Amino acid sequence: MPISDWPKADRPREKLIAHGSSKLSETELLAIFFRTGTRGRSAVDLARDTINHFGGLRPLLDASFEEFRQIPGLGEAKFTQLQAATELAKRYLQEKMQRSHNLTSPELTREYLSAHLRHYPYEVFAALFLDNQHRVIAYEELFRGTIDSASVHPREVVRRVLKHNAAAIIFAHNHPSGVAEPSLSDKEITETLRKALRLVDVRVLDHMIVGDGEVVSLAERGWI
């Protein structure tokens, strides 16, 4: 049955207007985004089938175009729209963390770093550069590949810190395996960087490990 034939209170758009987006399911939100379904399938049916196919919203948003187009009714237009919406969400989080905002929320920091790092199929080492009031100056992805003491260069990190005139820094990198548990190498890298940055009077506030649905803070573990 077309959504237009549903009771008005059950239609996703009308529900959103009446009750707000937080009251809708992921299927209903995706249906609004898709706008239309396919022959014999409403946009809600298409949204439900898509989420079930990928096993959740996160793998759907991380899917490649080739994976996305395997679903009947999904093609280039919907893929590019979804990628644009995902990027807008990342930039929204970045705007919330701009220089005018003090970095006082660990959850916002986790959310921001997860949005930027969790989708990479390889390891990426990044940093949030902060001023002396812990306001965000910049976010940079510094190193890619296997993250160990041979690939993370303290001299380059110090150079970037001095460029931004940062007073403090938060490191982060992802574990493509999805398991966010810090390794011995992660701890060693953190300590090496702490020693290097201490020479230029810059504090390392944290090193966060981004997994699949989880972000582990070394500071909260008492390792910084």
From Swiss-Prot:
GO biological process: one example: proteolysis
GO MF annotation list: metal ion binding; metallopeptidase activity
InterPro entries assigned: MPN, RadC_JAB, RuvA_2-like, UPF0758, UPF0758_CS, UPF0758_N
Record keywords: Hydrolase, Metal-binding, Metalloprotease, Protease, Zinc
Residues given in the record as Zn(2+) binding sites: H173, H175, D186
Motif JAMM motif: chain residues: 173-186
Database matches in PROSITE patterns: MPN, UPF0758
UniProt entry tagged with the keyword Disulfide bond: no
PANTHER family (alphabetical): DNA REPAIR PROTEIN RADC, UPF0758 PROTEIN YEES-RELATED
UniProt record similarity statement: Belongs to the UPF0758 family.
Protein's name in the database: UPF0758 protein HCH_01020
Native organism: Hahella chejuensis (strain KCTC 2396)
